[in-house]
């Protein structure tokens, strides 16, 4: 007799499976500070995938020291601008912003996203945050940053994507002093990350709209005569007679895709400034040409091409720093078949 036990179809880990609130993913935590002061996150736009030939530098790997083919994701990373500094205080309900100061000269495209605060006395606002830090009322200092997609030819938008980034520093005073130096300035990806380091990626996955329970949850098709009674791709039962309600655990049709997903410890294989080094013949499908700064991430990244990808210092770094990888070849063969 066949076994009646089997793994449960689908997973409740990501319930409720509904659309993300925004196309901009969120980081809800920041790693502990190490090294020199810098931003702890960056943002770019997904271009597509290709592959590289590199020397395997994984310790104790069967192919250590040999040439291997590795799939990579290309992310175009134009410079971002620091729009504001924000100070947080912690109370019984969590952290809340208690003071902020905005840069004076911001890009006019930012008005398409948010109403820019009126120009105030920047020196007075900075002095106020400094006093709050001295009084011990500030729990954290973060930076408000935004992207500049108008410089990209593959992303047909001018409206910046605005988000918040943590600042890596050993104490609040150092964080605040560093944030004052970058307020209103452009920050490039090389100021935040370097070749060979690990990062966490966050993005909104490809949206697939409304799908049935077979595709959405992976349940089996009806078998035998049950499939001939008008319900081939439906769940066998919605539940017991009592309790007289349908549990949220029952696999049913609904939204699939367009969810936020965060992946840990993705390795940066290369950071470059010449897009021709990675652009294939005829350009990337659904994107086009890479013209500016870019990074190569080992493996895949959630989301379609042109989707905003956020990068953060690893919050659960387990691997030692492998150093800069030795890349021998980057495939530029046409992706159009």
Curated annotation (Swiss-Prot):
Please provide the record's keywords in A-Z order. Ribonucleoprotein, Ribosomal protein, RNA-binding, rRNA-binding
Ranges for region Disordered:
1-20
Q: Which Gene3D superfamilies match?
A: 3.30.1430.10, Ribosomal protein L3, domain 3, Translation factors
* The keyword Ribonucleoprotein belongs to this UniProt entry's keyword annotation: yes
Q: Which cysteines are joined by disulfide bonds?
A: none
Q: Does the keyword Mitochondrion apply?
A: no
Instruction: List the SUPFAM superfamilies hit by this protein, alphabetically.
Output: Translation proteins (SSF50447)
Domain of life assignment: Archaea
The record's section on Pfam families has: Ribosomal_L3 (PF00297)
User: Cellular component per GO?
Assistant: cytosolic large ribosomal subunit
Can you name this protein? Large ribosomal subunit protein uL3
